[in-house]
Amino acid sequence: MTQQITVIGGGLAGCEAAWQAAKRGVKVRLFEMKPNCYSEAHHLPGLSELVCSNSLRGDSLENAVGLLKEELRRLESLFMEGAEATKVPAGGALAVDRDLFSQYITSRIESHPLIEVVREEVTRIPEEGIVVLASGPLTAGLLAQEIGRLAGSYLYFYDAIAPIVAADSIDYGKAFRASRYGKGDGDDYVNCPMDEEQYQAFVREILAAEKVEPKSFEKVVHFEGCMPIEEMASRGPETLRFGPMKPVGLVDPRVGVEPHAVIQLRQENLEATMYNLVGFQTKLTWPEQKRIFRMIPGLENAQFLRLGSMHRNTFINAPELLMATCQLKSDQRIFFAGQITGVEGYVESASSGFAVGVNAARLSKGEGLVVPPAETAIGALARHITNTEAAHFQPMNVNYGLFPPLPGRIKKKEKRGLLAQRGLEALEMWLPELS
């Protein structure tokens, strides 16, 4: 006897989770608060509304999001079915007609005999049965309080994201390894030194740079612990040098003295393929970030795997709270899916919903749960949000820095293609587990 699944949230993750569970013969009640109640960012009455952009980003396997989309195609994702049915010309990217996309997904969901769409706001999490929480990045009110009851201090309402660069794009001829005062293993950080002239030019460019204007639903809330670098720079020319760029305790071994200023890069993952710019959360536009941060000695040719941002975003500390299957450790009948888990982006949200929908159905039927291989884009993203360092967890787009490294020395221009090939091969080997 299968248990009915309750899905809270009719966005990309919730719809994908509901669809995958129903495809596997399980009844689903999908709760969506629209059109009775709208968030500040939503305007369409339908399901799976794309709020900010109609672009689903590049289709090439040279980009990890392209691989993620190809995996979802092969897995017969409703999200990708809808995207292909409503796509518009966009060069090498995949973009959709937002209204038609929402209408398509809504029609498919509402016409499925095993899915009941309930148009009402959820204010309490059911105390029995299997539940998928996919309420999205603007979760607020009583439902946010309910999630807070489960998550405790590990529920956040704003993100403060620093850029991440690929380790193999750092120029170690200019950067040096060291920890402040030799603490830890002594070389835990990669340090990019600046002299006084470089520092002053860097600060000038930050102050003059174009910034992202906050959305109407985003109140500007800056906490001292995660102040944007441009805000710090506006407080005085030396503020950054006494904040995230302070050089004290860091001696450049090539000259034997402390630099005028230092940008520290901290290892982001166990494989040491990604490093983040410590304390460099920012609201500079992405083109300005690339231009200005490539002024940093050692990062002139940096490959940015994630760019900085600060915005309204309800999410949990997934590594602290969730199992590898995105079940709540403290109550395994509850799954989390979508951006509330810390995945960032449309495709990533659908991917999260796919994996959770499959496992919610399997739990309902008393079957063993499955985890996608880490070599796949779906698996690499899932592993990141549930198995990264909880203390520094922030939302993340899919990127090749999340994947297990390839064995041996690989030419840089060949690496992405080989990672994509390995990912698709791993996916094909995983498919029998899903049947």
Curated annotation (Swiss-Prot):
Residues binding FAD: G9, G10, G11, L12, A13, G14
Enzyme class, broadest EC rank: transferase
Per its record, what are the GO molecular function terms? flavin adenine dinucleotide binding; tRNA (uracil(54)-C5)-methyltransferase activity, 5,10-methylenetetrahydrofolate-dependent
According to its UniProt entry, one GO biological process term is: tRNA wobble uridine modification
Q: Where are the transmembrane segments?
A: none
Task: Give UniProt keywords alphabetically.
Answer: Cytoplasm, FAD, Flavoprotein, Methyltransferase, NAD, NADP, Transferase, tRNA processing
Q: What role does this protein play?
A: Catalyzes the folate-dependent formation of 5-methyl-uridine at position 54 (M-5-U54) in all tRNAs.
Family, similarity comment: Belongs to the MnmG family. TrmFO subfamily.
Q: What is this protein called?
A: Methylenetetrahydrofolate--tRNA-(uracil-5-)-methyltransferase TrmFO
Gene from which the chain derives: trmFO
